Amino acid sequence: MMFRLTSVSCFLLVIVCLNLFQVVLTRRCFPPGTFCSRYLPCCSGRCCSGWCTRRCFPRFGKRATFQE
């Protein structure tokens, strides 16, 4: 009887620990200079073009030129 009670309590303890780890890992954030996305947020600053930065700067691409 004691073995059964101990194994059940250990099993429940493992379930509780796994739930706590899931909450901690899903609520983590990333420092500036690391990859980010909508589901992986930055700790401070913003997610600009997939990278955590303090400020977002506009990026200008190459303009198309007409050739005659």
Curated annotation (Swiss-Prot):
Signal sequence, start to end: 1-26
Coiled coil: none
Disulfides per UniProt: C29-C43, C36-C48, C42-C52, C47-C56
Localization (cell): Secreted
The keyword Cell inner membrane is annotated on this UniProt entry: no
Modified residues (Phenylalanine amide): F60
Propeptide section residues: 64-68
Description of its domains: The cysteine framework is XI (C-C-CC-CC-C-C).
Protein name: Conotoxin Eb11.7
